[in-house]
Amino acid sequence: NADTFFGNMGKIVCKLKTIEPNARIFVVTPQLRGDACDKDIRYIASELAKLCDMFDFTYLLDMTAHAPVYDAEMRKSFGLGFHPNPMGYYAYALMVANYIDYVIRSNPREFATIPFIGTSLKNKDYK
């Protein structure tokens, strides 16, 4: 992998998959900001989607497409400059948790054996 943002993301996922091939990994895209950098954010999101497609059990949490735009108006209530304030972190945590819940409920067989990952235990009903 090249020494680029995406190359290094690939290295990280490869390393995690080397440690535990059955690990479930969630990759999160950035939120749009409602300004000129949104084009770059959309590009990053599309490349991260490709990265997820390269690995088993690697899921995209596409905040670029599905989260509110983190624009100046939103930062008035939920931000401290660029980063969220405590209320913003709480709201973001709820978004991520709900998105993960959606992914799990949409792929129940892929998550049914989670308690056994990293062990020699198996559930005969699942492969």
What is each model feature region?
Residues 1-6, 31-33:
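Oxyanion-hole/transition-state-stabilizing segment in secreted/luminal serine hydrolases
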Residues 12-45:
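Active-site segments of SGNH/GDSL-like serine hydrolases
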Residues 32-127:
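Catalytic His-Asp segment of secreted/periplasmic serine-dependent ester chemistry enzymes
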Residues 3-10, 14, 90, 94-97:
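Amphipathic, non-transmembrane alpha-helical secondary structure
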